[in-house]
Structures are given as structure tokens and as C-alpha cells.
């Protein structure tokens, strides 16, 4: 039986997967071991670790209740990473997928879990060289985590549109705002959590899947949102890694506002109807971003994603005030109003330069050096 470890409600943590680049043509390089060795020459106390292939590195924040403190920590981690990368002549970048790397060139990181994933999923493991942001939100108990997971499912298209940063993949423009999620879709346990209404019901589902030999732990579920019982959180896993160090904090603030509304209103309207259109709405956000549509199965209506996001932000104003996140709410509103996205900026660079290497060089410079408040648009 999975035990849900209680945590302070509405606390936050984020994880970011980053590209490791050579500085000749800005392709991925197998630099994670060398970079980690350089980073760990002196004690630092930050959560920095390898990921499934050797052109990736993951950073994680501590637990925060205040998003401004989270930004301060991310800036400090960035300083450490950039200093270490300079010593090795490496570049670092955000973005959901490298624009022109080829999956067959990647190497699995020599860690037992990654070896098992590679043995089970074959070439999909190397194709999983994509880069995401995960957001953890503290929950008081397992029942609250189940409710919040279902509540957030309605807003997943918003997170996709706000974070989309992978228009190019394997050297081509995909026509999508985010190509990263197509790699995630290939895994059999991707998608969304089943419609269970309590932690006991979730445990019964998990135990059945475990008894069937399908899963051994929660890590085997590649859902867009999942409870994380060992942390006492709900984890949003849908976002591309943004191009700047500030945008992850805006996304975390949005998640915190939504969670506060869910908890304050004692939301418990768990039913299967919203999941009838979940995959379609998710596709619309991946393909069209802010220009996508959202279909409401209950009201049998369609609404533009941008309009729905702006309506939601208006409804969250009292929660932003209570959390001290008015600045973040205003920044999110501006992005939605102007349809500002990382994907659009990357396409503009390619239109100007005609070079995907130049695209990656610019996105690397932005992640490594841009000051907070300096947007890509």
C-alpha cells in the first residue's frame, strides 16, 4: 500500500531538465558526467543530477511557499551551472526539445533505472531526450492529492501553451508549438490518471496494476499529472522547459493559485466527462498554443484557449493577492494577451538566420545570461 506523506499545503518545488551543448555547432554533447564532476568540486547543497541520456542534466529547487524565494534559488543554481559549464566550454539551454539532434546519437546514462527503462522501451528511451519542467504542489493528504490531480486536468492546455518551447525536432519545423509531448505519448503508461475519487481507490488501482506486473512504483506512470506520495505532492509534468530562468516560476505560481482555489472551494466534482475531451484539448494546445480551442464536454461548447486562460486568470485574482503573487499573475496575463511564447521566438530567429545552430546558440545565451524580466518576445 502506498502511504501518502503529508506536506504543507500549497508549498512548491520545481524540477528543470536542461540541454548540455557543445559550443561549436550547439548540438547536444555527452557532457553530463564531466559537468557534474565540475559542479561537485565544492559543496553547494543544490539538487543537481543526471537524466536518462548524457546530453541532459536536471536541477531541482528546495520546497518553497513564496515564488520569489524560488526565483532567487534558481538564479543561484544557474550561476553555479554557468560557472561550471564555462570551465568545460559547454553551453546550457532551456527548451522542450533540441532542434536538430538525432536520437540514435544519444547514450543512456549508466544508472540502473535508466538501463532498465532502455531495456524495456528500446529506442523510445533515447527518443526521450526531451526536456520538461515538473511542478510539485504540497497537499495535506492523499484524498486532497487525488482531488487536485483531477482539478488541474482541466487546465493542462493552459500550461502547455504557456510553456511551449519545442517547435523544431530532428531538424524540421514540426508545425507544433510543442513537439516534446509526442515523445511522451509513445509510452504505454502516459496520459492521465484514471477516474478514482479517493486515495483508497487509487491504492486499489495501484495494487492491481502492481499485481499484474505492469508497474513497480509510481515512477512507472508517465502521466501528465500524478500524485507523488513520497513527497506529499501533486506533480504537473506537462510543461516544456522554458527558455528563461524566470518563466518556470510564473508557471509554478499559476499552479499554486489554481491549487489554492481548489482547496479553498473544497472542490470535489470528480467525474469522467472532462476526460472525454482531455486528449483533444491537449492536442489543440500542443499544435496551436494560444490559438487552440478547448471543448467542454459537459456544456457541449467550445472556447478559445487564450480566452479561457484570461478568464481563469481573472478568477484567480483574489488567490494571487492572498499568495502575494500579483506580479506573476500580471506577467501571465500579458503573455496570454500578446500570445507571447518561446516557440514563436525560436521560429523568428530561424526566419532571420536560416540556421538551427544559431537558434540553439541564442536560446543557450538567453538561459545562461538573461536577467529576470527580460522576456524572449
Curated annotation (Swiss-Prot):
Catalysis: reaction(s): L-cysteine + L-glutamate + ATP = gamma-L-glutamyl-L-cysteine + ADP + phosphate + H(+)
E.C. number(s) listed in UniProt: 6.3.2.2
A Gene Ontology biological process term: modified amino acid biosynthetic process
Regions annotated as coiled coil: none
GO molecular function, one term: ATP binding
InterPro entries in the cross-refs: GCL_type2/YbdK_subfam, GCS2, Gln_synth/guanido_kin_cat_dom, YbdK
Pfam family, one: GCS2
Family: Belongs to the glutamate--cysteine ligase type 2 family. YbdK subfamily.
Known role: ATP-dependent carboxylate-amine ligase which exhibits weak glutamate--cysteine ligase activity.
Name of the protein in its database record: Putative glutamate--cysteine ligase 2
